């Protein structure tokens, strides 16, 4: 009976689709265009979305933060003619029950600077809400005060290139576990390009790469997956010994809250 209760208890947790708790648990090696990553378990990163143009070309990733909102990188240059695809795992398959969602409004952070890549965040308001399910749900947003110290093991996901010179991106969603890198250590690679609105991770034999942009860097906090970073920029060769750079979500939360409350 105890086992039955446990199962129904887990079913209940899944049914509410709270943020940061996948109904299908991810399995990460080392926790477990991601270089040296691995295929994810289908549906285990339910907030991951693919941003596609009208031809169906995947150009960036993003994360669902609610039924109505997606967060991505400003440098992705999303337009209202693009679509958000939720619930996808294998982009080469027609068998998946995906949701193709139109974008009503694009809110690019007005302080985004394409030269310094500071404030690399855009919010997308969906024209119709995503239907939350076992394979589609939201990631938790951090508070301004949340801290993700150096060494924290986090995860990044995406359909980006698995080698910098690969001709195409992988069909199946890739994942990698990687540590947060201190600002001082990151500056050893990138110098003054690193600012307080960025957070670094990797240099551990894995890397984000072209096509992963806009996607999530998530860390577990109090048992839920929380969005610590948005894939922003890094080595042109997707070097696995150089940290990749992510927009620091905690530093951008005041702007996020302002947009969500006003809309």
Curated annotation (Swiss-Prot):
Signal peptide start and end residues: 1-18
Keyword Transcription belongs to the record: no
Pfam families in the record: Trypsin
Residues where Phosphoserine is found: 93
GO molecular function term, any single one: serine-type peptidase activity
Matches recorded under SMART domains: Tryp_SPc (SM00020)
Main enzyme class: hydrolase
The reaction(s) this protein catalyses: Preferential cleavage: Tyr-|-Xaa, Trp-|-Xaa, Phe-|-Xaa, Leu-|-Xaa
Keywords tagged on the record: Digestion, Disulfide bond, Hydrolase, Phosphoprotein, Protease, Secreted, Serine protease, Signal, Zymogen
GO cellular component labels: extracellular region
E.C. designation(s): 3.4.21.1
S-S bonds: 19-140, 60-76, 154-219, 186-200, 209-238
Peptidase S1 domain residues: 34-261
Source organism superkingdom: Eukaryota
Active site per the UniProt annotation: 75, 120, 213
One biological process term in Gene Ontology: digestion
Compartments it resides in: Secreted, Extracellular space
Family of this protein: Belongs to the peptidase S1 family.
Protein name according to UniProt: Chymotrypsinogen B
Organism: Mus musculus
Lineage per the UniProt record: Eukaryota, Metazoa, Chordata, Craniata, Vertebrata
